[in-house]
Amino acid sequence: MSRETGAVCRMCRRSGDKLFLKGDKCVTKCVFEKRPKAPGPQLGRPRRLSDRGQQLRHKQSIRWSYGMTERQFRRFFGLATAQPGVTGDNMMILLERRLDNVLFRLGFGTSRAQARQIVMHGHILVNGQKTDIPSYLVKEGQEITVRETSKATAYFKTLAENIEAKAIPGWLSLDRKTLSGKVISLPAAGDIDARFDAQTVVEYYSR
């Protein structure tokens, strides 16, 4: 399945929840708040979703939030299943370790989509090595920095002035002066967004 290319606001409406896929625009100009119902013709009272349908909707919400294709998402589920421990927690921890998500958490992008573009355009170094793969899984102790040539661009100059307001998760640290972050520890189950119940993903793929 290819990456979703349609209007991202429709994904929020289809999921029935505000996913903040457009970053700051979701605060100031939110289509979901005006039209929270699913897209398409509204023919009377909406049907009640089956348990399977609810699992699918929740699985899609997590997948869309992290900006992944179904194939990528299923691969991460396979990786989580192969690890010891709780599969749902394992999967969410893997998703949090993605480089594009780490940049988003550090405040380098207002959305994961923007953070993914920053990675793909070659602006980011991991332990001094250029890394342009958004799905790269960071490890404990690694340092994430912006290339010196990239710091001279208008985007990163503005970022350096405005990044102060971003709250950083406890498993990451940020040096705002140098625009560099560090993975202090790997994320734990308690660090995961409370909106996401990964157990529904496990149940969906296990049937």
UniProtKB/Swiss-Prot annotation:
Residues 97-163 form the S4 RNA-binding domain. SMART domains: Ribosomal_S4, S4. Keywords: Ribonucleoprotein, Ribosomal protein, RNA-binding, rRNA-binding. PROSITE patterns: RIBOSOMAL_S4, S4. Disulfide bonds: none annotated. InterPro entries: Ribosomal_uS4 (IPR022801), Ribosomal_uS4_bac-type (IPR005709), Ribosomal_uS4_CS (IPR018079), Ribosomal_uS4_N (IPR001912), S4_RNA-bd (IPR002942), S4_RNA-bd_sf (IPR036986). GO terms for biological process: ribosomal small subunit biogenesis; translation. GO terms for molecular function: rRNA binding; structural constituent of ribosome. Pfam families: Ribosomal_S4, S4. GO terms for cellular component: small ribosomal subunit. Belongs to the universal ribosomal protein uS4 family. Part of the 30S ribosomal subunit. Contacts protein S5. The interaction surface between S4 and S5 is involved in control of translational fidelity. One of the primary rRNA binding proteins, it binds directly to 16S rRNA where it nucleates assembly of the body of the 30S subunit. This is Small ribosomal subunit protein uS4. It comes from Dehalococcoides mccartyi (strain ATCC BAA-2266 / KCTC 15142 / 195) (Dehalococcoides ethenogenes (strain 195)). The gene is rpsD.
